C-alpha cells in the first residue's frame, strides 16, 4: 500500500510541476504545459491530457497513460506498458522508446509523427489516420500497421510478420523489412528504395507501385490488381501469379521459377534470364532468356501471351511432374 501511495504522490507532484511553454510542430494546438523527468505509474495517469510537452519521462506499469490525449509533444521518454496512445490526436514523439510490453501502443489515433525512435512493442498502429515515421526501428513489428490510412515511412527498419495489412494511401522511402505476408490487402501504395525479405508480400493488394527495390520471398503478389515494379530485383519461387494488370519495367528476376501463372494484363520487361515461366493467361513478357517456358493449352490460350525472347531453352506444353 505504501509503495502504491508513493507512486501516486509522485505522479501528482509531477503533474503539479507543469509550467507554461509553447512548442511549434505539426498542425495542432500549441502546448502550454510541461512535464519533465517524471516517473508515472498506475492506470491512465494522464488520461485526457491536452497541450502537454512531456520530456525525459517514464511511463511505467499502468495501462493507457495518454488515452484520449490531444496536442502532445513527447521527447526522450519511454512507454513500458500497454496501450499508451489510444484515441489520441495530434501527437509528436522524438527520441522515444516503446518497450516490448508497450504493445498495442497506438490504436484509433489520428495525426501522429514519430522520429528517431525505437519501438520494440508488437501490434502497433491499428485503425490510425495520418501516421508519419522517420528514422524509426520497429524491432518487433508483428501485426503492425493494420487498417490504417495515410501512412508515410522514411528511413524505417522493421522485423515481423503481417506488416501493413489492409492499410491504404501509403508512401515509403528507404525501408527495410524482414517478415512474411507484408502489405496483404494494402491499397494505393508507393514504395521507393526498399529491401524486403518477405514471403507472400503484396497479396490481395491494389494500386501498388514499387521503385528501385529488392524483394526476396516466394509467392510474391498473388491475387493483386494493378501491381507495378520499376527498376527492381526480385527472387521469388512461383511469384507474380494470379495478378490482374502486372507491369514490370527494367526488372531482374533472380532464380525465379514458375512465374506469371494465370496472371493477365502482363507487361513485363525483364533484364537477363527468367528461370521458368508457367501458363500466363494474357499479356506480354520480354526477357533476354527464358530457361523453361511452359504453355499448357488445356489450362490457358498460349496465343493470348506474347513472348519476346531470343533464347528459350526448353518449351513444354505440360508442367513437369512434381
Give a label for each model feature:
Residues 1-27:
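N-terminal amphipathic/basic-hydrophobic helices that include classical n-h-c signal peptides
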Residues 18-322:
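Long, distal/terminal scaffolding or interaction modules
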Amino acid at each position: 500500500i505504501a509503495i502504491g501511495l508513493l507512486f501516486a504522490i509522485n505522479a501528482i507532484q509531477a503533474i503539479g510541476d507543469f509550467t507554461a511553454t509553447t512548442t511549434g510542430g505539426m498542425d495542432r494546438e500549441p502546448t502550454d504545459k510541461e512535464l519533465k523527468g517524471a516517473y508515472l505509474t498506475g492506470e491512465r495517469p494522464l488520461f485526457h491530457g491536452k497541450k502537454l510537452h512531456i520530456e525525459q519521462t517514464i511511463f511505467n506499469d499502468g495501462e493507457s497513460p495518454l488515452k484520449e490525449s490531444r496536442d502532445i509533444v513527447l521527447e526522450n521518454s519511454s512507454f513500458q506498458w500497454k496501450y499508451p496512445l489510444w484515441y489520441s490526436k495530434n501527437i509528436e514523439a522524438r527520441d522515444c522508446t516503446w518497450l516490448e510490453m508497450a504493445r498495442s501502443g497506438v490504436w484509433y489515433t489520428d495525426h501522429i509523427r514519430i522520429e528517431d525512435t525505437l519501438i520494440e512493442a508488437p501490434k502497433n498502429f491499428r485503425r490510425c489516420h495520418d501516421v508519419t515515421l522517420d528514422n524509426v526501428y520497429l524491432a518487433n513489428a508483428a501485426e503492425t500497421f493494420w487498417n490504417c490510412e495515410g501512412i508515410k515511412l522514411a528511413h524505417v527498419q522493421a522485423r515481423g510478420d503481417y506488416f501493413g495489412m489492409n492499410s491504404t494511401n501509403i508512401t515509403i522511402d528507404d525501408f527495410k523489412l524482414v517478415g512474411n505476408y507484408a502489405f496483404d490487402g494494402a491499397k494505393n501504395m508507393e514504395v521507393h528504395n526498399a529491401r524486403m525479405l518477405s514471403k507472400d508480400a503484396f497479396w490481395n493488394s491494389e494500386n501498388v507501385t514499387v521503385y528501385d527495390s529488392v524483394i526476396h520471398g516466394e509467392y510474391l503478389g498473388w491475387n493483386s490488381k494493378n501491381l507495378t515494379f520499376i527498376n527492381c530485383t526480385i527472387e521469388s519461387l512461383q511469384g507474380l501469379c494470379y495478378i490482374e494488370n502486372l507491369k514490370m519495367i527494367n526488372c531482374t528476376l533472380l532464380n525465379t521459377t514458375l512465374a506469371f501463372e494465370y496472371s493477365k494484363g502482363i507487361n513485363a520487361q525483364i533484364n537477363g534470364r527468367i528461370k521458368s515461366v508457367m501458363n500466363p493467361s494474357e499479356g506480354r513478357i520480354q526477357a533476354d532468356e527464358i530457361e523453361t517456358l511452359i504453355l499448357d493449352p488445356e489450362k490457358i490460350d498460349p496465343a493470348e501471351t506474347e513472348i519476346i525472347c531470343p533464347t528459350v531453352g526448353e518449351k513444354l506444353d505440360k508442367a513437369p511432374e512434381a
